[in-house]
Amino acid sequence: MELTRYEIIKILMEYVTDEIVVCNIGIPSKELFKINDREKNFYMLGSMGLSSSIGHGLALSVNEKVIAIDGDGSVLMNMGSLATIGKTTPKDFLLLIVDNCAYGSTGNQETHSTCTDLYQVSKACGIDSIGVFNEEQLRDAVKLALSESGTKVIVAKARPHNENVPNINLVPTEIKHRFMNAIKK
């Protein structure tokens, strides 16, 4: 059975230790904040489609593992990011694409990932990719991706669902300064 985005993020965060995490805009960021708020989490509050690009840029400029959590709708909005990631292949970057075939933060309208296989697209861009469809596959893929160097993409199929979580109680400048201080330590 497919997991929800909240369940996928929760499982990912069970394995995160000191990695940098950049999370997609809207409800996914609120869900991550509820699951495991940490200084090395960057919560996107705007700029749909840029979580993968911000994570990619960080992965090229820091000497630690960077994880970007993105949704299918955001990746579809910025598909060029996959080609750029595939061309530059940072040494420690994981892009987790939660593919629920929906724009979750705006009411679960259907995305074009119903007819566009993001796993195949990321593979075609030259990225070491895996598609997962259940909890066991997700856990195995996350453990593998975090234990190896290189660039990896996990496309986790999910069922559309927005967890009822509170808003992030940090203002954008707080998020930025807290994050910047954490990654320069």
Swiss-Prot record:
Deleted gene: phenotype: Cells lacking this gene are partial coenzyme M auxotrophs; they grow poorly in the absence of coenzyme M and retain less than 3% of the wild type level of coenzyme M biosynthesis.
UniProt keyword list: Coenzyme M biosynthesis, Decarboxylase, Lyase, Thiamine pyrophosphate
Annotated metabolic or biological route of this protein: Cofactor biosynthesis; coenzyme M biosynthesis; sulfoacetaldehyde from phosphoenolpyruvate and sulfite: step 4/4
Principal EC category: lyase
Cofactor note: Binds 1 thiamine pyrophosphate per subunit.
Gene3D superfamilies for the chain: 3.40.50.970
InterPro entries tied to this protein: Sulfopyruvate_deCO2ase_bsu, THDP-binding, TPP_dependent_decarboxylase, TPP_enzyme_TPP-bd
Entry superkingdom: Archaea
Cofactor: thiamine diphosphate
Pfam family, one: TPP_enzyme_C
GO MF terms held by the record: sulfopyruvate decarboxylase activity; thiamine pyrophosphate binding
Enzyme Commission no: 4.1.1.79
Catalytic activity: 3-sulfopyruvate + H(+) = sulfoacetaldehyde + CO2
GO terms under biological process: coenzyme M biosynthetic process
Xref: NCBIfam families: sulfopy_beta
UniProt similarity note: Belongs to the TPP enzyme family.
PANTHER family xrefs: SULFOPYRUVATE DECARBOXYLASE (PTHR42818:SF1), SULFOPYRUVATE DECARBOXYLASE SUBUNIT ALPHA (PTHR42818)
Quaternary context: Heterododecamer composed of 6 subunits alpha and 6 subunits beta.
Function: Involved in the biosynthesis of the coenzyme M (2-mercaptoethanesulfonic acid). Catalyzes the decarboxylation of sulfopyruvate to sulfoacetaldehyde.
Name of the protein this chain belongs to: Sulfopyruvate decarboxylase subunit beta
Organism: Methanococcus maripaludis (strain DSM 14266 / JCM 13030 / NBRC 101832 / S2 / LL)
